[in-house]
């Protein structure tokens, strides 16, 4: 029986959808290929770093900035949406001179790495129509033109505005919990589930702490790599970040 043109196109669409489903399943089920951290970071680009508390998300972002500075001579902006002057000065004294702490997006430089720590504070899904969110959308849209690498740090994507999620070129996980995959956005649940299983399969807390799972959204596939903390990372630096988070929670900032 000869297919009519309409039926033929319908079958093509079914095959196309099946092919896309196979590509999706292959990416989820395949073993992540091993790469170096620097090789998988896009420049310019937008990277989202997610995972449980105290798993090294901020330390990872600082290592990426260190790599980009040593290889490309890029300065870095450490953007903290809510930080008092006392903590800002303390932080600035510890980090390298080529990294500047700011609370204002107007101070983001061209051709730089921008670390947006606890991005959910001002890129929250519930605030998607606010002036802050609209301004952030505009900055993401021109990140390529301004030659910026923007690193968003958050526990999981459900906290973030959808426009931020769709702008990313890479997603990097540091060990998530089962709750993270359970309460993720529907679009991200399978990916976070894979991340949970990936880290569960790594023996030893030290090995888990070093490991990263990376989703390449441009080529749609998973990679794995290890990271280490940059030379300036100390317990004091970690405590400052924790104090800022506690301070913001007491002020009623949504995290």
Regions found by a protein language model. Name each.
Residues 86-98:
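Short, aromatic/basic amphipathic alpha-helical patches
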Residues 67-77:
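Post-Walker A helix-loop "phosphate-sensing" segment adjacent to the P-loop in P-loop NTPases
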Residues 3-38:
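N-terminal pre-Walker A segment at the start of P-loop NTPase domains
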Residues 73, 111, 209-211:
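Short, surface-exposed beta-edge/turn micro-motifs
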Residues 47-66, 82, 96, 100-189:
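Conserved P-loop NTPase motor cores
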Residues 4, 21, 35-36, 58, ...:
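N-terminal secretory signal sequences
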Residues 7-11, 36-41, 111-114, 131-136:
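A broad, low-specificity signal for short, low-complexity segments enriched in glycine/proline
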Residues 38, 42-54, 60, 140, ...:
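P-loop NTPase motor core of the ASCE superfamily
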């Amino acid at each position: 029986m000869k297919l009519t043109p309409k039926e033929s196109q319908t079958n093509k669409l079914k095959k196309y959808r099946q092919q896309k489903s196979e590509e999706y399943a292959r990416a989820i089920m395949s073993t992540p290929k091993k790469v170096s951290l620097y090789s998988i970071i896009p420049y310019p680009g937008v990277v989202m770093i997610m995972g449980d508390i105290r798993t090294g998300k901020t330390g990872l972002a600082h290592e990426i900035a260190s790599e980009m500075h040593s290889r490309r001579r890029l300065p870095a902006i450490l953007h903290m949406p809510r930080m008092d002057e006392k903590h800002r000065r303390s932080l600035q004294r510890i980090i390298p001179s080529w990294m500047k702490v700011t609370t204002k997006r107007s101070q983001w430089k061209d051709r730089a790495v921008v670390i947006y720590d606890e991005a959910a504070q001002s890129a929250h899904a519930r605030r998607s129509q606010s002036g802050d969110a609209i301004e952030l959308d505009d900055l993401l849209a021109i990140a390529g033109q301004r030659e910026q690498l923007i690193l968003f740090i958050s526990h999981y994507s459900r906290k973030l505005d959808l426009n931020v999620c769709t702008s990313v070129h890479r997603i990097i996980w540091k060990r998530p919990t089962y709750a993270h995959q359970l309460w993720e956005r529907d679009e991200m649940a399978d990916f976070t589930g894979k991340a949970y299983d990936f880290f569960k399969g790594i023996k030893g807390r030290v090995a888990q702490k070093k490991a990263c799972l990376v989703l390449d959204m441009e080529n749609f596939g998973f990679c794995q790599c290890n990271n280490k903390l940059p030379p300036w990372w100390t317990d004091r630096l970690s405590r400052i970040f924790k104090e800022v988070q506690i301070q913001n929670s007491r002020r009623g900032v949504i995290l």
